[in-house]
Amino acid sequence: MIRDITLGQYYPGDSWVHRLDARTKIIATLLYLIELFVVNNFYGFLITAAVLFAVIALSKVPLKFIFRGLTAVFLIIAFTFLLNLFMVDGRVLWHWKFLTITYEGLSRAFFMAIRLVLIIIGSSIMTLTTKPVELTDGLEKLLSPFSKIGLPSHEIALMMTIALRFIPTLMEETDKIIKAQQARGADFESGNLIQKAKNMVPLLVPLFISAFRRANDLAMAMEARGYHGGEGRTKMHPLEYKKTDKIAYLVLLVYLALMFLVSRYMKIETW
């Protein structure tokens, strides 16, 4: 399950989405995430899902690879679903002892789960189709106006990219530690959910040690290559908007306008 996390990974390719400017994908992803928290009806989620699957088709990233990332957060999605299902008051659909399911709770639980799925897939598409170097350059370019007020845009962009890239690295390291512990007789599968959580505690110390070791190796490698911050650095491949980026922005504007109209005039609310 841990190795199934796709957020932070890059899937090599030469699709239309891969060739888009990193800034275009970052801005589109941010607006997409904001829109997901604004949309409030079934048609909005349906249109969002259709647009997302169109982007996936254009990216040529296998659906199996993308949906694999959902298995790692299945428990979070399931917990959110159950929490909304039983904790929201409203018109009662089913009642047994202290458990009550309402129409409003069922609706909110379903759409909250859909929202989480769309958030995870949409965020993964950005990292799967953008090289870490391009992601760093894009973030730095977007944050560069704030450098006039003393904000270290290059350092912040680099930290965010490294943190994002380290997610699959740490998950892979966790998987190795679990297998090593199991080879020594450790049991992480038996018991209830609380017992399983307690069984994971011994993994924290070796995981932290491994994380610090990898961070130290990365720092030494950057220092050996003469890294001294963003000041005075040039780019081998400077970011430049192309015709496809302008088309992508136009499609994004049409999508946002459509979502605004759907959310405003189609009053089939999900909560």
How does the language model describe each region?
Residues V73-A186:
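Juxtamembrane/interface alpha-helical elements of multi-pass membrane proteins
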Residues V51-V61, I76-F79:
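Alpha-helical transmembrane segments and their membrane-interface exit regions
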Residues G69-I77, A113, V117, L207, ...:
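Loop-to-transmembrane-helix entry motif
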Residues N41-T48, F65-R68:
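Short, aromatic-rich membrane-interface segments at the entry and exit
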